[in-house]
């Protein structure tokens, strides 16, 4: 493995603050997680950063790891991958339920905050983003959702030629290995997608019964041909451990002599000769260094950082650049614009039946699930907290699903803006039902706040800015009302823990959403694909308009938000982007 620097992220298996299992079992789990153990990893085959490379990929996240594998597989090209965070040896990354810890860990998480939003009762939002090899896919809730066919057909309609559903479906099928609950395998791709419907908590049956009572569809998978309806979510795991892009793609790529990974590298700006990108200026080991690319520089730093790097390099709205003392290279007003994100809300209830709280809270339960995980890699620790849900139409007149629902057999308390380092199940049985409108129409911005590349960005989501988005919130709240009011779920409700959605009118649903909703961690669109610089940032081949040798490959190029979780389409996009890059080589 060629690696310029390895930073050890986890120094103690018994990390304080995450209290689902006792320390002794934390240590057992760490020791069993051999691929992600807390033992010190030595540096090997250290390579000088002054060496020339064909491709420099900035960001070893969900997209960057895929690119590294695909661009290096032929052996023709030398690939350098830069990551601002650490290598990601933490066992909390490997353990599926461990994201309760990484969600707040500043060693693994940028922990961004948005500007306060009047539309959300003056609140600032907490935006966790991965600062580690594997990116946000290393700290997310693992749900694997391709998106709906119309999402990608809309991409093409918006100017992203060649990104329609028929095309991207083939990329998904190439990329995936789908693992059935009985051990059957479909496909032969490096990314494992696990059916865990046989492991979910028994209380989920009340959700399925409620959906059936309302006449809502049932489906085996939101990723299948019939993807509308109640289902157990599929997740990215293999052998009971997280299967993120680093494990699936980068790990095998690093065995090749033509791939180098540098961690702890902060990209500062892109260097140009005329309008051609030729190098990237970075801060590495306390020194400013310049890394040259013989062919292309590829930004894969995500929807928050990719537009910032362009702006810091002189590509962005000219008045913004001038206001921060940056000499404009190209006036590109769409850089940082078109920001979209899912907003969601949870309704918490005390339950009349045992839930996951009864398993994860008491000491005996912690011991039992820890042993189950250590011995069989199964059970609650091998799952996401988001066990069930699906895509739904809020009313029969809708032609497409407009809501994504979540049903979680556990309740827990956190504090705003990531201030709390403990995620602890409540000391009574409880469950959560929540929703997110699938396709918001509001558009925000992400911009630099300074010419200092280390300064926090200015994130302005512009949430609920359209009447359509507000109507979709009410529709989602009404759908949850109907579900909770069914005989099946009403039997499960002991009492409410939040404002009781069951008695709310439309205005009250919207007001409650404004007061309590939060991001579902799916920001996209800030370097959107399109035909020209007049309507977008990159071409359908992901080349920055008007610039040579520079592409953006991550969720920032999505013309519109996909209907569900965004990690799967981000990896798909990178997989297909690699084909385009190699065609142009």
Model-based region annotation:
Residues 10-13, 30, 38:
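Cysteine-centered motifs
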Residues 74, 78, 86-88, 270, ...:
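Glycine-rich loop(s) and the adjacent beta-strand/alpha-helix scaffold that form part
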